[in-house]
From Swiss-Prot:
GO terms for molecular function: ion channel inhibitor activity; sodium channel regulator activity; toxin activity. The modification Phenylalanine amide is found at F34. One of its GO terms (cellular component) is extracellular region. This is Delta-theraphotoxin-Hm1b. Pfam families: Toxin_12. It comes from the Eukaryota. Shows high stability in both cerebrospinal fluid and human serum. Half-life of the recombinant toxin is >40 hours in human serum, and >70 hours in human cerebrospinal fluid. Negative results: does not inhibit Nav1.4/SCN4A, Nav1.5/SCN5A, Nav1.6/SCN8A, and Nav1.7/SCN9A sodium channels. It comes from Heteroscodra maculata.
Length: 34
């Protein structure tokens, strides 16, 4: 189960495709890919 945009995360692996974990704020943000 992946985390959606603004979902809590520890690493990018926690986030859905095209999202990366912001480790300063610990949420999934768009990584700029389509």
């Amino acid at each position: 189960e992946c985390r959606y945009l603004f979902g809590g995360c520890k690493t990018t692996a926690d986030c859905c495709k095209h999202l990366g974990c912001r480790t300063d704020l610990y949420y999934c943000a768009w990584d700029g890919t389509f």
